[in-house]
A protein has these predicted regions:
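Acidic ATP/Mg2+-coordinating residue in the GHKL
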Residues: 72
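Short alpha-helical Gxxx[C/S/T] motif in the catalytic ATP-binding
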Residues: 106, 110
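Conserved catalytic submotifs in the C-terminal HATPase_c
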Residues: 21-31, 63
Length: 139
């Protein structure tokens, strides 16, 4: 069991030269494999910063889940591509750009890690007009 806020805060500190805003509910603890979870969150942050200039992370607790939102202000991903980008090595030509570094594994690895924790990842349009990654984990 780990304090989710501590984990997120420590990860975000590694990106001190980047624009990342966090808004975390207090006292969120969750069962996690710490190193795997850190890798997942870093993949999501790296993805957001690769395509946008700003990332926002916030958390919300429901009756049965903890939800982590990772928003960016990049070009987003068309809804018809949401399932495809979860596949290993899948890259989008137009909306996110082939000129970016990466091989198309970040979202796939993050998805696998969250699923192994009993949760799921979904993609939506962000209020920042980019991509919102919604991570839902059981309490």
């Amino acid at each position: 069991t780990a304090n989710l806020n501590d984990v997120i805060t420590k990860i975000v500190e590694k990106y001190q030269d980047k624009k990342i805003n966090i808004n975390l509910e207090e006292n969120l603890t969750i069962n996690m494999r710490l190193n795997s979870f850190k890798r997942c969150l870093m993949n999501l942050i790296d993805n957001g910063l690769s395509y946008g200039k700003k990332v926002e992370i916030f958390t919300k607790k429901t009756l049965s889940n903890i939800i982590i939102f990772v928003d960016d202000d990049g070009p987003g991903i068309p809804e018809k591509e949401h399932q495809n980008v979860m596949k290993p090595f899948y890259r989008i030509d137009k909306s996110r750009g082939q000129n970016k570094a990466g091989v198309g594994l970040g979202l796939s690895i993050a998805n696998d890690i969250i699923r192994s924790h009993g949760g799921n990842i979904s993609l939506e349009k962000s209020p920042l007009n980019g991509l919102r990654v919604k991570v839902s984990l059981p309490l």
